[in-house]
Amino acid sequence: MAQAAQKPETPTSPATRARVFASRSLASLEEEYGNDRKFIWSVARALQILQAFRLRDGAMGNNELSESTGIAKATVTRLTHTLTELGYLKRDSSRKYYPSPTLLTLGYTVLGKLRVRQLAQAGMQEIATASNASVALAWPEEDTMVYVAANAAPGADGLLLDVGSRVGMANTAVGRAYLACLPQDALEQKFARWEVLYGADWPDLRERILASIDSVRTDGFCIVEGEWRSNVRAVATPIYDADHQTYMALNCGGPSFVLDPVRLREEFGPRLLHLAAKLGWRSPW
């Protein structure tokens, strides 16, 4: 039986966006660091290889890694060999690569230094239990938000993303809560990049982002429904990490049939806002 033709990728297709969100492209790195003699390209490419595994489940071969990162296959082959020898990658029975638990030693060091993460845990769990949903703390990275803490109500972990998971910044409540803290010039830089990335979808998306930003600056939080996933709604508020002098965001999210929009606005949004204040809120506006 002939296989159906695969739908080609477009500049704004999910697959293309995933590559943009997962790691900085070679072109962007070359544009920024092409004249930097101290910049070590082999290190940058090795890190891009490791980041590529966040794009999909399962193991990846050298061809897939080359296509995903834009790095030449010969270079990928040398990098995967080196990373395997160092213990950061393993190979499965099909000889494809997957990340080794050895990588956790690097991540654990990062999490251990995020004091705000430890301070937020008890309050996050209380809100998760009360909402029968999940609560997460996310750190900004490029055009994504990376989960550094996640809690769920007992038996309600179906949508809980693990620590280290990424969600888009433009189409989530947690991302827009963070965007509300950016100075105007930084916000416009992101908008200029997203205009290209999202194409025809951008004008409407931009208006929704601006509405969410206005909500955060007026009410302290924003609610987004059906944009990250069609059946999910969430509320989020910014949080200030004094140790690292940076803004992050807290969200409470779950299935639409579980999280009533009225309770999100009247109960869980204010509770997230209260938790952010306890942790040391600092207004950027």
Q: What is each stretch, according to the model?
A:
Residues 2-113, 117, 125, 277, ...:
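N-terminal helix-turn-helix
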Residues 33, 206, 230-231, 246-285:
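Juxtadomain coupling helices with adjacent low-complexity linkers
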Residues 129-130, 226-231:
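Short loop/turn motifs at secondary-structure junctions and domain boundaries
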Residues 98-193:
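Amphipathic alpha-helical effector-binding/dimerization core
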Residues 2-25, 29, 156-228:
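Short, solvent-exposed recognition segments
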Residues 239-242:
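Sensor-regulatory modules in signal-transduction proteins
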Residues 233-237:
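Short hydrophobic beta-strand micro-motif common in sensory/regulatory domains
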